[in-house]
Amino acid sequence: MGIQSSTMKLPLIHEILDYWHLLKPKIMYLVVLTGVTGIIIAPGNIHPLIAVISTLCIALGSGAAGAINMWYDSDIDALMTRTKTRPIPAGKISRSSALEVGLVLSFISVTIMMIAVNYISGILLAISIGFYIYVYTMYLKRRTPQNIVIGGAAGALPPIIGWTSVTGSISIESLVLFLIIFMWTPPHFWALSLLNYHEYEKAKIPMLPVTHGIFTTKIHILVYSILLFPITLLPGLFLKDPVLYEITAIPLGLMFVVQAFQVFKSSISYHYRVMFTYSIIYLFILFTCIMLSSF
């Protein structure tokens, strides 16, 4: 009886994991981190329960956008090695089920944010989800190599949403956090596109290396990385412990530029992968340090 019960539970566990992967959890982790950063560094007080609700809504909104993105992109996901194991092309979840999950989570996250937190945070969450789905996924991604640059605005909104959850208004400080993520996004994804250049070409996605070549992409990565560096120093102007922040942000940022320069010089995929991996670690450490420097 016990063996039969365990056997019956396995398919359920696998199904739950499939739906979890549909929500793009790796992206969700960074989205939640940046959103929580906005909540923590914002002036004023917020009830812990409201902070938790805001964080959950940001997470659900991110997952909703990820699910609808997978629904819309399931045709091109099936063509690329990196994405063909995703739940829809792998045949684990139907397109209709993915769309239903995305729409339901979108409605729940935005509605709860508006009712339990405040209207502006709910509106910004709706804009973030809508921008990622309609502007980036449905329009920009398959039409222009600037898809990542413009579409990155959606992923840069969570710290503003976190900030407005506390204050009810947008500020310069929250816009600085937005700008950091906005400038970080292109070199992060262009490093990935260098790694998967032929995959994007096969799927006819106009990523920068496909439309303008590898050398041009490397120049863009280097330029954006250099421009990102001084922007990441700006939080030191308003954090309570600017010394802690700057002694962390400066070497982190310099290493980011060094990695970008390595990509520029190299034609080895190893350096592209290192740049991509480091960019994730970089953002995680940077925003963690922003939180710690606010106390």
Swiss-Prot record:
It is a multi-pass membrane protein. It catalyses: heme b + (2E,6E)-farnesyl diphosphate + H2O = Fe(II)-heme o + diphosphate. The gene is ctaB. Pathway: Porphyrin-containing compound metabolism; heme O biosynthesis; heme O from protoheme: step 1/1. HAMAP family: CyoE_CtaB (MF_00154). It comes from Ehrlichia ruminantium (strain Gardel). It is found in: Cell inner membrane. PANTHER family: 4-HYDROXYBENZOATE SOLANESYLTRANSFERASE, PROTOHEME IX FARNESYLTRANSFERASE, MITOCHONDRIAL. Carbon 2 of the heme B porphyrin ring is defined according to the Fischer nomenclature. Keywords: Cell inner membrane, Cell membrane, Heme biosynthesis, Membrane, Transferase, Transmembrane, Transmembrane helix. The chain crosses the membrane at residues 30-50, 51-71, 93-115, 119-136, 148-168, 175-195, 219-239, 244-264, 275-295. Converts heme B (protoheme IX) to heme O by substitution of the vinyl group on carbon 2 of heme B porphyrin ring with a hydroxyethyl farnesyl side group. One of its GO terms (cellular component) is plasma membrane. GO terms for molecular function: protoheme IX farnesyltransferase activity. Its EC number is 2.5.1.141. Belongs to the UbiA prenyltransferase family. Protoheme IX farnesyltransferase subfamily. The keyword Calcium does not apply. This is Protoheme IX farnesyltransferase. One of its GO terms (biological process) is heme O biosynthetic process. NCBIfam families: cyoE_ctaB, PRK04375.1-2.
